[in-house]
């Protein structure tokens, strides 16, 4: 009745007897009433019904929809159902392996018994035959001796005994051959390496096919295949975390190598930048030194130029003053000579005029000193302005000033020559 109810549950569902208005029970795949072996593939209790290896009916739920829900869930092969299923299947295989070993032991024992049972009588018959043969040989020798002695009756009696022994020996030989033929005609058995059933060696192919298509043989074959498949799946599942860990480790190592190479590149870049900055600083220092040397050379040249210009200006001013004084002296001397020549009688007026001239000369000399100071200040100012000018303008100025100086010196020489001539003429006049 239980198997029929399970069959109806599988065909029509567990809620087959509920009324339309009654609430259906929603059972999840992880409920304890659900067969976990069926979720993993199949229930072993369904494989061996009505066989010698029948495991009895399974009282838990076998539902294909629940199995599909389990396969689609995120906890598939993570709850441990597959490992429990594998252990149960391995226990069934261990049991059938023990059955196969017992079958082999029984076959070996029966074969030993048969061989020992057949060999025992045969060996005894051989021994009897050998004894009879020895007796026959002895009796024949005795018969020959009796015949040579002329004892014919005794020899005939012994001859009858020899005939009886020969008949007995032939009987033993025929018995041994019969036992061997019976042993040869007995059927040979073997054990099936899958389910442990006994098979007849050389049996008809139809009976062999019936055995191979039987529930027991196919059930154990399915169990063996499922065990191998589950082992492979679980091995891959255990290798996946290791592979993920290995891939993660390799990724971390690659990232560390990339970071190390990046740090090395940054270090090289910083080193290159420092070297570039050092070279730039060195070039800046070189430019500053060259600039300072040029400024010192320009300053020294400008200082020397200012000194030369000051000396030239001073010389020019002195030469101009001398020329002016000489020209005044010449004018005064000439006027004095003319006045003396024209107005000799007015000596007193001349003296007065001379005194006035001397006073005016002193006044003019003071004004000249003031004018000279003013000009020197202006020259200093012009020198500061000249300091800002370029080297080429200063050189051009120098050339122009040199030419002016030469011209002025030539003028000065001419004036000096003229003054000397005037002095000579004045001396001649006074002497006259």
From Swiss-Prot:
- Would I find ATP-binding among this entry's keywords? no
What sections of the sequence does the record tag as coiled-coil? 124-181
Give residues where Phosphoserine occurs. 3, 110, 115, 420, 425, 431
- Region feature Disordered, mapped onto this chain: 234-432
Principal location listed in the UniProt entry = nucleus
Q: Which domain of life is it from?
A: Eukaryota
| Basic and acidic residues compositional bias, start-end | 234-287, 302-311, 368-414, 421-432
Q: Where is this cross-link: Glycyl lysine isopeptide (Lys-Gly) (interchain with G-Cter in SUMO1)?
A: 424
GO BP field: mRNA splice site recognition; RNA splicing
Query: Any idea where this protein resides?
Result: Nucleus speckle
One annotated Gene Ontology cellular component of this protein: U2-type prespliceosome
Which keywords fit this entry according to its UniProt record?
Acetylation, Coiled coil, DNA-binding, Isopeptide bond, mRNA processing, mRNA splicing, Nucleus, Phosphoprotein, Ubl conjugation
Question: Subunit structure of this entry?
Answer: May interact with SFRS1 and form homodimers. Interacts with JMJD6. Interacts with RBM25. Interacts with RSRC1 (via Arg/Ser-rich domain). Interacts with RRP1B.
Q: What's the family?
A: Belongs to the Luc7 family.
What task does this protein carry out? Binds cAMP regulatory element DNA sequence. May play a role in RNA splicing.
**Name of the protein in question:** Luc7-like protein 3
Q: Organism source for this protein? A: Bos taurus
């Amino acid at each position: 009745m239980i198997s029929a109810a399970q069959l109806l549950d599988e065909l029509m569902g567990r809620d087959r007897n509920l009324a339309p208005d009654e609430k259906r029970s929603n059972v999840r795949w992880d409920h304890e009433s659900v067969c976990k072996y069926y979720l993993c593939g199949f229930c072993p209790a369904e494989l061996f019904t009505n066989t010698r290896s029948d495991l009895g009916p399974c009282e838990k739920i076998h539902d294909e929809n629940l199995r599909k829900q389990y396969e689609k869930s995120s906890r598939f092969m993570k709850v441990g159902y597959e490992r429990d299923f594998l252990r149960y299947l391995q226990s069934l295989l261990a049991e059938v392996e023990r059955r196969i070993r017992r079958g082999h032991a029984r076959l070996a024992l029966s074969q030993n018994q048969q061989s020992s049972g057949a060999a025992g009588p045969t060996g005894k018959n051989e021994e009897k035959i050998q004894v009879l043969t020895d007796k026959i040989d002895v009796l024949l020798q005795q018969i020959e001796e009796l015949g040579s002695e002329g004892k014919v009756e005794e020899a005939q009696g012994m001859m009858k005994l020899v005939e009886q022994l020969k008949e007995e020996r032939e009987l033993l030989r025929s018995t041994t051959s019969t036992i061997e033929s019976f042993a040869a005609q007995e059927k040979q058995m073997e054990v099936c390496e899958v389910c442990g059933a006994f098979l007849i060696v050389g049996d008809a192919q139809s009976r062999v096919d019936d055995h191979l298509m039987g529930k027991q043989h196919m059930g154990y074959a399915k169990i063996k295949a499922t065990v191998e498949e589950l082992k492979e799946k679980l091995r891959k599942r255990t290798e996946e975390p290791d592979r993920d860990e290995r891939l993660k480790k390799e990724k971390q190592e690659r990232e560390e190598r990339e970071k190390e190479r990046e740090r090395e590149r940054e270090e090289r870049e910083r080193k290159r930048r420092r070297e570039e900055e050092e070279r730039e600083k060195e070039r800046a220092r070189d430019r500053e030194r060259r600039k300072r040397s040029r400024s010192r050379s320009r300053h020294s040249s400008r200082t020397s130029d200012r000194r030369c210009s000051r000396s030239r200006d001073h010389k020019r001013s002195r030469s101009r003053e001398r020329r002016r004084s000489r020209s005044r002296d010449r004018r005064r001397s000439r006027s004095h000579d003319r006045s003396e020549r024209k107005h000799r009688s007015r000596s007193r007026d001349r003296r007065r005029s001379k005194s006035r001239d001397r006073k005016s000369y002193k006044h003019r000399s003071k004004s000249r000193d003031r004018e000279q100071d003013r000009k020197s200040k202006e020259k200093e100012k012009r020198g500061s302005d000249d300091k800002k000018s370029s080297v080429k303008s200063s050189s051009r100025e120098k050339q122009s000033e040199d030419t002016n100086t030469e011209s002025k010196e030539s003028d000065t020489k001419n004036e000096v020559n003229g003054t000397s001539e005037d002095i000579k003429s004045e001396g001649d006049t006074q002497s006259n």
